[in-house]
Curated annotation (Swiss-Prot):
Keywords from the named record: Bacterial flagellum, Cell inner membrane, Cell membrane, Chemotaxis, Flagellar rotation, Membrane
Gene Ontology biological-process annotations: bacterial-type flagellum-dependent cell motility; chemotaxis
GO cellular component: a single term: bacterial-type flagellum basal body
Name the record gives this protein: Flagellar motor switch protein FliN
Membrane topology value: Peripheral membrane protein
InterPro entries: FliN (IPR012826), FliN-like_C (IPR001543), FliN/MopA/SpaO (IPR051469), FliN_N (IPR031576), FliN_T3SS_HrcQb (IPR001172), SpoA-like_sf (IPR036429)
Entry-linked SUPFAM superfamilies: Surface presentation of antigens (SPOA) (SSF101801)
Organism: Salmonella typhimurium (strain LT2 / SGSC1412 / ATCC 700720)
Location(s), subcellular: Cell inner membrane; Bacterial flagellum basal body
One of the record's GO molecular function terms: cytoskeletal motor activity
Signal sequence, start to end: none
Gene name, Swiss-Prot/TrEMBL: fliN
Family of this protein: Belongs to the FliN/MopA/SpaO family.
One Pfam assignment: FliMN_C
Gene3D superfamilies xref list: SpoA-like (2.30.330.10)
Amino acid sequence: MSDMNNPSDENTGALDDLWADALNEQKATTTKSAADAVFQQLGGGDVSGAMQDIDLIMDIPVKLTVELGRTRMTIKELLRLTQGSVVALDGLAGEPLDILINGYLIAQGEVVVVADKYGVRITDIITPSERMRRLSR
């Protein structure tokens, strides 16, 4: 009966051969680096494919909101509001209006009248760095 913890010399040689075969197989199958597997090579890919991807999102609806201003009030003040009440806002008259898409500030503009309806003329597009600065307030 052989001891499992102390293999014989012929078993040791066979075991070494198995380990060597396994290591050689592993080296042969892992010639690519992990970065090659994760990242694809950038290049002059198919531009029409990218345009098709953009076309997929073109019909997604977004909510555009134009804010005159904001204010804070207590529930008591809110409940006291009646028809004809005036609520003072923090925006000043003539100050640019905030234009938001889905709640995120993207531009500023001014009120215009278009065919007897209100409209907004965009006067300034907010840069990504400006958006980040405003979000951190």
